[in-house]
Amino acid sequence: MDNNPNINECIPYNCLSNPEVEVLGGERIETGYTPIDISLSLTQFLLSEFVPGAGFVLGLVDIIWGIFGPSQWDAFPVQIEQLINQRIEEFARNQAISRLEGLSNLYQIYAESFREWEADPTNPALREEMRIQFNDMNSALTTAIPLLAVQNYQVPLLSVYVQAANLHLSVLRDVSVFGQRWGFDAATINSRYNDLTRLIGNYTDYAVRWYNTGLERVWGPDSRDWVRYNQFRRELTLTVLDIVALFSNYDSRRYPIRTVSQLTREIYTNPVLENFDGSFRGMAQRIEQNIRQPHLMDILNSITIYTDVHRGFNYWSGHQITASPVGFSGPEFAFPLFGNAGNAAPPVLVSLTGLGIFRTLSSPLYRRIILGSGPNNQELFVLDGTEFSFASLTTNLPSTIYRQRGTVDSLDVIPPQDNSVPPRAGFSHRLSHVTMLSQAAGAVYTLRAPTFSWQHRSAEFNNIIPSSQITQIPLTKSTNLGSGTSVVKGPGFTGGDILRRTSPGQISTLRVNITAPLSQRYRVRIRYASTTNLQFHTSIDGRPINQGNFSATMSSGSNLQSGSFRTVGFTTPFNFSNGSSVFTLSAHVFNSGNEVYIDRIEFVPAEVTFEAEYDLERAQKAVNELFTSSNQIGLKTDVTDYHIDQVSNLVECLSDEFCLDEKQELSEKVKHAKRLSDERNLLQDPNFRGINRQLDRGWRGSTDITIQGGDDVFKENYVTLLGTFDECYPTYLYQKIDESKLKAYTRYQLRGYIEDSQDLEIYLIRYNAKHETVNVPGTGSLWPLSAQSPIGKCGEPNRCAPHLEWNPDLDCSCRDGEKCAHHSHHFSLDIDVGCTDLNEDLGVWVIFKIKTQDGHARLGNLEFLEEKPLVGEALARVKRAEKKWRDKREKLEWETNIVYKEAKESVDALFVNSQYDQLQADTNIAMIHAADKRVHSIREAYLPELSVIPGVNAAIFEELEGRIFTAFSLYDARNVIKNGDFNNGLSCWNVKGHVDVEEQNNQRSVLVVPEWEAEVSQEVRVCPGRGYILRVTAYKEGYGEGCVTIHEIENNTDELKFSNCVEEEIYPNNTVTCNDYTVNQEEYGGAYTSRNRGYNEAPSVPADYASVYEEKSYTDGRRENPCEFNRGYRDYTPLPVGYVTKELEYFPETDKVWIEIGETEGTFIVDSVELLLMEE
């Protein structure tokens, strides 16, 4: 972060907003006509009026081609120029604008001729005029568009290129549709149609290529770079990619009637903060990680906003989001808490109303909090209020206000698509998700910034299929993904993300609502890309509809381009049986390892039930087999909770008309079985009512885990675990089984149901770790559940479709260290418990973890239950394991006592007293790092299997690590020089001449003064009459001297000199001479005073003593977790040989001194400058 001391007042967040946009009386008054406004209007037009004819032609004139002059055309490249900091040369600019003006004039003539011809289509003169106007228009466009692709200016001219390309495609479609009536021969029409299909691909690939080039160009490490990056991404999505996504609809032979598309991509407004665009160094990647990863579309239902307070300032500290699948077709699901649930004020609930949230008016808050005198300043970057406005086509809906309405208006950057109506009706985007950018830098600053995601309004809440149009539905609007199907980032021209499979199986299920009569027949088409030949299968409500063979479209390893995708269809028409149905798409007959991508499906208008007696008999048998006896006293051990749910589904599907009494009786028995299952389950909250709800009980997990309601696989809640990009930050879920629930010398079993998984690691930990990595294929391959079944009359999953019979032999049990094939969705893992001790409370840790990028899992119906008492060999084995564990535990305690004592001595020696509120006068940064490393030599602070779980030594580790943090804070506070280590570049320093801050191989930032005329200085406030120590660590290259001078306005000057000398040089008040640097380096690199130890000093215990849990005969063993030792540790690299540390004492007579750095010749390299107040 940039610690600029001159930042002492709030800078309005919207100072960079469009000055022509005002907020007046709650309405947005638009006084300008920007490229974004034009593009949004055009996108709306293309989405709603994509029908050939005079209406379309005149619509393009009204939106852009009939109203633009040179200044309006110039606004398009200017917009991008400002984003990429590149100015187009005057000649290229003038040429482009001249071409666009010529096209505009010509198209207005074309449009007027088209209008006249459509009014009198048989008039020979008008037909001849249309042939002339088309040829002129096509020739002009063919010539002009390549001139808009000027070398080196492709990016700034991209938005006008796309406008011209869109115009060209529309004209080519006109001739493809109307050419025969204009009098063109069939050969000409076919030739122009071939031009159309070819140019759709060419223009698309060009636009995406240069969009990506520009996006890469604006990326940088700091927050101001990310702001520009996000603005480029957002604005060019609106002005380029959204328009390009509709290019394929110009294919008049594929889309001869009205075609309705949807844009499911999301764009993002900046985290709402004051000073955000330039205050945070190195945070771009952190901010970008806050953006939601590719996902199925969901519908934002509610936001619960929590409030925290910091020194009297209330702010948005965290929030909880609930959402529903598309069409509200499944149970509502909740995302993990973003930020933290502050309790400074009651939570504020923002619930979905009308057509969703179309506008936010936010109030960012920035405060610099002065904590007494000196450098102890805190900065607060938060949001203290937001008004949420709801969209409606008919009436004003009351807004929801969190604390207060602000002035940062989302409509300033994402304006409406129609300015002729109120924004509530003319809005272009609705709020789809909110994440939280959180950062707390100790006592330096606190940052809590909600980040709003916005989705185009064309992405409807439901999948509606009418009768009179071609309906395109992106498959990211699916309700469920088949096992092995993933959502991946779209290639840029699909209007959103796409689905991907690498093995045969179900792709997804899509819930659709039919508004046409059920007699209406359709043909289905699929837009896909594939590296292999394959078969597509479709079904509706579990009923097979189509099956066909299709060819590969791309080579393995090639990038996705427009030509990689193909739209294919089936010849056999079909009709829906229900107004609300489930459409299922699957891919089969290809080898795993190939890639299949699905963009969307299109519905084009064209022109099983067991007998009731058998159902009852089967249900009765299934219920009776749950119990150990006919009196239903106990459950069979091998009856899982998941199986009870499936039997319950079987009973619920019995016919009320035929066997209502028997159905009710069986239902009571199944409920009794479910209660027995709950009673024997030792897990807390097995139904996943929440994660991280309570600190000391229930489930704990990472924030990217989602809880979802029951679907057609799970009757109850289940959890979804996603992959991770960093092994040290895995996706995890864990719970501890308390010692009080366990019986001595007993075997326990963890089991559950996995819908699908890859790289899912399961652990049971007591004396040692039982560990399995589970890869389970999804329901589309082995387990044909009701994923293809229709929904019920109220939108619930129809669980009455046929299932595979439950077979205990398919259970995947991993017992006594045996390896498991994991061909089944059922899993189980055993662990043996020896002697129990309530005081020790060892318990059993249950852990689920994914640490790979491609990993994923969906699981539920988890159970941890008593299996059987231990006897014979099993009893002897657990006693042996317990004894070994206790022996190693005792050894660990002995070794820890020694290491802790040494670490505590190192930490204590940093401070003056046991209150740890004041450092020793000679404590330096290297001593603190050395003590920190000593603290990190304490083993078993956290479990090696999951480093968020405290180990046996967590308390003493965190105690000492807290004091290390205090030492760093105190050390930073007593150095009155700002940015004395140059980690923030030249911030706070005044510079004359040329100097650099470089990062050397040892990852330290150093000041490099390469020229004798250069000077670096800083004015520092001090206390007159007090003593200070000026300490400088530096290195001199070549001849001459490097000097660090301290002085006041008049006299009282002293300096430290550095030279690359051989003979000894002595300076007054200096504690080190030129020939002393070797000794000095020894102090930095490995040895310190008697009150502290350095890095290289040998510890008093062996460095490789084994983990106390390791037991190779009982498990696969446990190894150290390298991520554990990264917790809180500041990697410190000693200085290279050659650097010298010198210091002098200084007694200022006024309240200001100047520190000046310079040299006489050669190069002067400064590592750090410190001015430390002497202790009184």
Swiss-Prot record:
Protein name, per record: Pesticidal crystal protein Cry1Aa
Source species, domain of life: Bacteria
MF GO annotations: signaling receptor binding; toxin activity
Protein family per UniProt: Belongs to the delta endotoxin family.
GO biological process, one term: symbiont-mediated killing of host cell
Signal peptide limits: none
SUPFAM superfamilies assigned: delta-Endotoxin (insectocide), middle domain, delta-Endotoxin (insectocide), N-terminal domain, Galactose-binding domain-like
Alphabetical list of CDD domains matching this protein: delta_endotoxin_C
Described purpose of this protein according to its UniProt entry: Promotes colloidosmotic lysis by binding to the midgut epithelial cells of many lepidopteran larvae.
Classification lineage: Bacteria, Bacillati, Bacillota, Bacilli, Bacillales
InterPro entries: Cry1Ac-like_dom-VII (IPR048645), Cry_V (IPR041587), Galactose-bd-like_sf (IPR008979), Pest_crys (IPR038979), Pest_crys_Cry1Aa_dom-IV (IPR054544), Pest_crys_dom-III (IPR005638), Pest_crys_dom_I (IPR005639), Pest_crys_N_sf (IPR036716)
Protein keywords: Sporulation, Toxin, Virulence
Effect of residue 77 to L: In strain: BNS3
Note: Toxic segment of the protein is located in the N-terminus.
Keyword Nucleus: no
